[in-house]
Amino acid sequence: MKVTILLIAGGGVIHESDELAQRRTWANNPPPEIEVIWLRGRLGSEFVYENNTLFVPCANNFSSILEKTILGIQWVESNRSFDLLIRSNTSTYFNLTNLNHGHSRYKLDSVGGTFETSRKTIYSYPKGYRYLNGSGLYLGRAASSALIRMKYDEFQGIPDDIAIHSYLDSAGFKFYEIPRNNLDLHHIFVPRTQVRVKSWSKAELTIARMDLVHEYFQGNSFLERLSRWVMVELNEIYNSKLSLKSINNYLIRQLNNKRNI
């Protein structure tokens, strides 16, 4: 199975540092079946691809993420052969070995990701609206082909992941859960294929997590991985308030996810 990972990049010094961390860790030498592309906006009317970076003709800021996504997928559809397209960002770690050997978990006629619920009402989307989080959208060819027909200007002011979920839902696609680990949410490292390492409080912590998680997955033995797992947790304890409450919240969240699948 051929996989293309499209990472939303740009938007400031912090994102630049996160991208560099990705380039020297998990994305440094991907297997031939997996291609990693960083996606940026630029002035002008042309698409430019260089050094695994795709520049698309739109603004390179937070409010243009949906437009950038649509243009990026449009280019990939025309220039790459793939079975699975993953849209993500620069603060996410992917275990490419697991990704490359876990083909059976991906439903190419549906859309995969991690479900979340909105915390407030956003236009016609009520509080509690259930959607796939944008840090990992797993799209087969049918879904990616549908997305390039999406008109981004009809979703102004709506978060890109809610807009994408709503559009694909109205197009008749079904959705399925792909578990991820979010270190900033509960500070407990679960070695999944996708690990969200973003820190909202300390920019340097995102990079430290990227490095530590990468070292874990490079371990060749159980003891090596155990010791490196401990290093990840020690880093979380040092940099955050890891408590029994956070562990309890993590377990409750996992239980709720299973009930909602």
What is each PLM-predicted segment?
Residues 1-20:
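N-proximal low-complexity "stem/linker" segments adjacent to membrane-targeting elements
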Residues 4-8, 36, 136-138:
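Conserved, well-structured core segments
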Residues 7-9, 40, 88:
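Short beta-strand/turn micro-motifs composed of small residues
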Residues 18-34:
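Short, acidic, metal-binding catalytic loop of nucleotide-sugar glycosyltransferases
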Residues 32-43, 112:
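Short, hydrophobic beta-strand segments that form beta-sheet elements in well-ordered domains
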Residues 38-82, 96-97:
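Active-site-proximal specificity loops/subdomain of glycosyltransferases
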Residues 66, 84, 88, 92-166, ...:
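Conserved catalytic core of nucleotide-sugar-dependent glycosyltransferases
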Residues 154-261:
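C-terminal catalytic/acceptor-binding lobe
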